[in-house]
Amino acid sequence: MSQTQLYRKRIIPEECVLLKGDTILYRDSDIIVTKWTSIKPKKDLHHGFSCYFLKDGYKISKFYYEDGRLLYWYCDIISYTYNSETDTFVFTDLLADVIIFPDGRIRVVDLDEVADALESGAIKKEQVEDALRKLNKLLTIIYHGEFDSIKKNLEQFEQ
């Protein structure tokens, strides 16, 4: 079997990028855990770890500064396709995101992008419905103080 390939597909801006720098640390039928360095260098974001929750439809990432300090947790709402012949995943970013800061503050971001994409036809109504349901499920977990159980899936693979 070939090596697993992961792609990130964005709706805004429209692009599909092979995550060639990502290292898969763990994979089963429920989750994929990766470590990576930033594709496009940014002032603060240097590297991180991500956990794709395949059945739940979100990717939880832990973003770090270059010196190893936690920047924040970043939660993408996603969908995906899988090609078993090529062992390839294409993860589509459904635009709505949640940021959890080290001090506990929570921000839901990019909902305007969801509206813009729906208005322009870049995203389908069904995708928006799917994204909102997944976002609601994730926020319910966060607001009920259960985010630690999600973080454990990722943190056990950090080295």
Tell what function each PLM region has.
Residues M1, I100, A115, G121-R133:
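Compact, glycine/acidic-enriched structural inserts
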Residues M1-G48:
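Charge-rich, low-complexity N-terminal segments
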Residues R27-S29, E66-G68, F101-D103:
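Short acidic-glycine loop/turn motifs at beta-strand connectors
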